Amino acid sequence: MPRRRKNLGGNPFRKTANPKEVVVSSVASREEPTTTLPSMGETKVDQEELFTSISEIFSDLDPDVVYLMLSECDFKVENAMDCLLELSATDTKIEESSSQSFVASENQVGAAESKIMEKRPEEESEDSKMDSFLDMQLTEDLDSLIQNAFEKLNSSPDDQVYSFLPSQDVNSFNDSSEFINPDSSNMTPIFSTQNMNLNGENLENSGSTLSLNPLPSHSVLNESKCFIKDNTLALESNYPEDSLLSSSLNVASDSIAGCSSLNQKQKELLESECVEAQFSEAPVDLDASEPQACLNLPGLDLPGTGGDQKSTRVSDVFLPSEGFNFKPHKHPELPTKGKDVSYCPVLAPLPLLLPPPPPPPMWNPMIPAFDLFQGNHGFVAPVVTTAAHWRSVNYTFPPSVISHTSPTKVWRNKDGTSAYQVQETPVSQVVRKKTSYVGLVLVLLRGLPGSGKSFLARTLQEDNPSGVILSTDDYFYINGQYQFDVKYLGEAHEWNQNRAKEAFEKKISPIIIDNTNLQAWEMKPYVALSQKHKYKVLFREPDTWWKFKPKELARRNIHGVSKEKITRMLEHYQRFVSVPIIMSSSVPEKIERIELCAYSCEDRSTSPRDDEDIISEKEENILSLSLKHLEFTEEKNLDVTKETMLPENVAYLSNADLNKRRKEISDMNPSIQSALILETPHMYFSDSESKLQATDKSENEQIEMVAVKGYSKTDTDSSMERVSPSTCCSENNQEDCDLANSGPLQNEKSSPGEIVEERATVTKKAFGKQKSKSTLEKFPRHELSNFVGDWPVDKTIGQRTKRNRKTEKTSSVQSDKKYNYPQSHKLVNSVSVNTDCVQQRGSPHESVEDGRKSQCDDASEPLNSYKYDAYKNIDKNSFNIMGDWPSSDSLAQREHRSRMPKTGLSEPNLEIGTNDKMNEISLSTAHEACWGTSSQKLKTLGSSNLGSSEMLLSEMTCESQTCLSKKSHGQHTSLPLTFTNSAPTVSGVVEPQTLAECQEQMPKRDPGKEVGMCTQTEPQDFALLWKIEKNKISISDSIKVLTGRLDGFKPKVFNINTKSDVQEAIPYRVMYDKSTFVEESELTSADESENLNILCKLFGSFSLEALKDLYERCNKDIIWATSLLLDSETKLCEDTEFENFQKSCDGSQIGPFSLGLNLKEIISQRGTLENSNSPVPEFSHGIGISNADSQSTCDAERGNSEQAEMRAVTPENHESMTSIFPSAAVGLKNNNDILPNSQEELLYSSKQSFPGILKATTPKDMSETEKNLVVTETGDNIHSPSHFSDIFNFVSSTSNLELNEEIYFTDSLEIKRNENFPKDYVKFSDEEEFMNEDEKEMKEILMAGSSLSAGVSGEDKTEILNPTPAMAKSLTIDCLELALPPELAFQLNELFGPVGIDSGSLTVEDCVVHIDLNLAKVIHEKWKESVMERQRQEEVSCGKFMQDPSLVGHTGLDNPEQKSSQRTGKKLLKTLTASEMLPLLDHWNTQTKKVSLREIMSEEIALQEKHNLKRETLMFEKDCATKLKEKQLFKIFPAINQNFLVDIFKDHNYSLEHTVQFLNCVLEGDPVKTVVAQEFVHQNENVTSHTGQKSKEKKPKKLKETEETPSELSFQDFEYPDYDDYRAEAFLHQQKRMECYSKAKEAYRIGKKNVATFYAQQGTLHEQKMKEANHLAAIEIFEKVNASLLPQNVLDLHGLHVDEALEHLMRVLEKKTEEFKQNGGKPYLSVITGRGNHSQGGVARIKPAVIKYLISHSFRFSEIKPGCLKVMLK
């Protein structure tokens, strides 16, 4: 068969580090050569014949090896022969080098028995043995074999042992015998101080321990040829430096990891590992194991485990990727000893990173010189563990560190035979051109996982020893094991970029970036650095035939990336990149990034353990970390506890296990210990659960991932989340987990056990994060790295947010430090701070806000409370937060706050009573909720820490405030999410004032007043909670437990008499019971119905249908929906109402306020209120803590974050609250009077917030409210009656928030309001009937929202309180006051002239217009029409729209309400300065009114479509140029389906030239044809047709040329004017000739011979001219068409006559042959002859002539495609 072109990209050409080192893939036994490489070899008859013949030629080589070589070379004889010749030569040398033996550790097969140097007659039998071993589990024979091998090794002199690595790197094994199987214990292998080369990977002993056979270094690693046969690594000892002993072959072990220079210690480790391996004898098919990422099977408690735990160094264990072959079949699990050795289930030998010490003098270029952040290096043996061993890994031991910078790809066959395709360098060819780079060069390797990038990188580094290989994968090598964690992708990329930056600064060259670099943006950081440092940028892709074959890539990549993942990555692969493209690229969409994110993500999924292992390894590092990173500590703790603490054999943690784990933890670093211990119980719970159960484990991973995501989510939303190490961790984890699972709701639901588990999860996360870095360090890094393609995006945001938290945490920690808090205290403190966070976490969105707020609030609450004398109560409560840990009261409130968001999220939260008693309870509950600690305990703990906590509090408050300030800025991002919080919170960002106030007030705090904070939650607390939950403890009155319910918080009073039976059956592993507080079904329903209610309440301007549609489009993700709405500048109804109301209240009562500040203050006060004992807190219906009512209120509040805030208002806090929530604390100057007012207002606000709630007070009111309320909320916020009814129902279920509020006001405040208040109160009962005009007005104003005037007097507030009553009263009102929004007033001024007031001096009062009922009715009708139109998605004219919204704002209520609102608005306006009110109203009106939900939705849909399109096109957006090119392409190929053309165009990366060239090549001619040519061809005779054909061919060729020649693309329409001219001339002469001949014929016919002769001569002349013209045209065509093709060894003969084509062919062939002989290059010439489509009759003429010529001149050629011949140059 014709010789196929050498596969330059094939492995055969890849050279191993040692050119003489031949890596022979171990193949399954000769018996199954084909199966061995099913994917590689084509089982064709000719291939079999070839195999047979070559096997005969190389009889000394194992047929498996021969087959492998053939398959690797694609059965190309020339390629295979080179490799086989080299192998045979190597084999001979091996035999000769008997004096030199390599240390070969042959685990499973006694292949080592015979040294390769020795040829043994038993080879055949050994081969069969090995095959059998490969195919079956290893048996005890292995032990004897190993012994024999060791004996041989022992016989070898020490001096022969050669170590590639300096002895310093080698840990000498103290007891080689240990390492050796007990059977072989009698043997003492010679381990010289010199490094012995172990085939570490061979450690996979099924039943036998690794046997280290120290063969002389120069001897081939494995036995004789048979060994080579089976194991594909024959290293020539001649080049010890190059020979990778490390790549010694394990005959039996499918993966051979050459452990070059292992110490005895290492050997011991190996021994122990082997011993451990013995325990897991089940052979595992690589296929099965491959998908799993390298697992660290660290510390199975196996006898071997007790051995030396020193992790072998990477240098000690040197694993060249090339040298590994493994037979996937049989990898018994080798438990790593104490994690000293990490096993890669993938069984892919992983190259080890050299240790930090300077690379050994004879370092192998194959091994990256970079050291991981961890110094320990361990021996890696691929291990496939049985399921049982899977879990029972003991994490107590520090993981061994083996750094594989570039793990080799896993080569495995489906049948488990070692279809050993040496991925990276199966066989090194004798001749390989060295690629040396001159100058400063940056080499960016690009390729999919498994394509050979790492090998190429090592090869380049070998050729350029001064170069350095930088791979992001290095980041994930912990203890020598590749442990990918997507959470750290961004961090890893950033880390790698920092390394690259250092390399650039050091002028290292070449700098080889060994990343996938799928897309341009991924390379941008490196290219930018190269540009900065004047480096030349080279892009290199592995020249492997499988680089774009997902199946083969999946088989070859060492990280177990699945085919599907690789396929997705391939879809995103940007094939054409250049520096300009890269520099102009931008980071893609998150999702895409995540998709593009390192394939290794799948590695995680492959082995549930990876995370844990990673964590466990991290744990080592983490353990060393101090708890100052509480968050991490906690997470670590979880991880540690989970991984480290869980004994391998612990299926379920018993108390003993817990203790044991504790001990283990104690073994860990004390610092972590403390954290762990704190968390341990929790961890135990979570650990035992998650860890012990695979599902749990996977869940944990998920949780981790989710948690990470959650964090990213939550973090994004709340930086605080992570700040609270334990609390946040616990809740967050849980929440994160929940987020992953059931959503944030579960956090609240989660029992302490849950929390613990969460915490554990978080801890785990933290651990995962803390590979070697402190959380704080890493998080910033995360923030820094917003990488996405290879790194997840979610996290970045979360981390960024988190960074703020960290700041908080840091501050808290610092404060802790200042006060020398024990770490546990720190935890508590951070937790307390985090409590907010945690609570916040409850609703990630809000949590950030709350966290910040809560901190600020904590500070501000005291401030406010101080300001307001309520400060005493509040102070007490708010300062309860003192040491980072809020005191019970503040905690309760704060928790509520945070929880409120959660509730908003429809997560039921334990709402704690506002009273001190309640606070206490709430504290306990809150603590329990957060910590699962009983309130009593918390108190006790807190009390112990009280003083310090106070100090901390002040300090921390300041710090937290600072953080808050920071966060407040950052808060905006999370605000949209926090919509669940009161809208005002969202709208208001904490302003520096708040901080200042907090700080100012801080001093005011009276530590004595504060409640003690608990620093630590004890397991008993969780147990107590658990028992309470399980009703196992009799309930005492001392504890009041509020259980969150969707239908409202109804306090479940547990009279907890902590009996002695408290200890009864306290599960030490408190499990996370998802249904602890709320059933999942409830959660689900809560999510949907609650979230919809929340959305409707928050965004009343949109119809329920629209919101529901948006909610569904957002996959029922309320956070997403809310974010969309907020991002679209839609303000929350509550927000607007509250703002307006607040303005009014503040204006009248408090005066101007900065909404953001006030919001925070209010929030803090809200917390304070809740905390404060004053009945007012009860009033805080929003808090819903005080009573069942309050709970219901809470629910309502949930519905309305506003309510939550309103509830926060207390008489004391009221003012601050007012500032925050106008509605919440409608500026109550007099706590009593104002409070009633504020309460009313709050109620009103609540009502507003809850349009439905307002009316919910009474069913009648509800119905009416529905009518009115549809408009009530914010003018724009129009709730459909159904929505309101829902709200009302919700309110009712919550025991009618308003009623509750009213009750609260009445009860707690004893609403001492003006007579109005009682009225209002009564009105609460019957709002409609009792409402005053003022009240109505206020309601109107509030409801109007946009028209709301800033100041509302108590009356007004009262009015506001009763919007519906306003309607009832409206019947008796003759006229109404309409408060015009400033915008509308200005517009009216402009449109219809001035009204006698200077627009500049316009005040709120001036904007009040008295309108009669008729006009009001007209306005109402118009308003209604506008609403209907909006709902119909019909845009109203701008003017009308402006008016309507204002009308909506003002007339939103009934006319009477409008009137009252006018009055109220007047009052408010009066109170507030116009400037203050106007901007707010302006801002509000502008944002809210001008954006409709439909617009937002349409935008979002369009945006989503755009993103989807981007995703589809790999982030490629069609710009104008691309579209023009596309159109041009359609013109060029009009006959081809445009969709097909678009696909082709896309496949060619939107390169018109390439696309056209490809299509021309495929079509063999241009679709465009010259009509004239065709006509002439058809008209004329053969000559004419021939000429026409030529010209036709020429023209098509020109067109094709045009298409093919990029430079000429612009002239496609008129590219060959000369050609056209020539052809026209030829045609003209042809016509003339035909005319002359016809005339001559006619003259001859009539007898005029002279005339006939003349015409004949003329015709002849014309024919000559025609030929000349055609010749010129042909020359022109040839030159133009082939100008760009000839350099590429392509000859296009289109458009030429046969003779011309042959002439050019001869000339070009001769020229190219000479060039090839002199300069090399392509050994072939592609000749495009065309298929004859343009020839007359469609019959090809050039092609047959060319073929005939080639045959006659003995050229070898093949027709690669129709019309294209590939001619091999001689």
Curated annotation (Swiss-Prot):
Keyword terms: ATP-binding, Coiled coil, Cytoplasm, Hydrolase, Nucleotide-binding, Phosphoprotein, Ubl conjugation
Name of the protein this chain belongs to: NEDD4-binding protein 2
Residues forming coiled coils: 90-177, 218-259
Known function: Has 5'-polynucleotide kinase and nicking endonuclease activity. May play a role in DNA repair or recombination.
Biased composition (Polar residues): 97-108
CDD domains: CUE_N4BP2
UniProt feature, compositional bias: Basic and acidic residues: 115-129, 843-856
Record text on subunit structure and interactions: Binds NEDD4. Binds BCL3 and CREBBP.
Subcellular location: Cytoplasm
Gene that produces this protein: N4BP2
E.C. numbers: 3.-.-.-
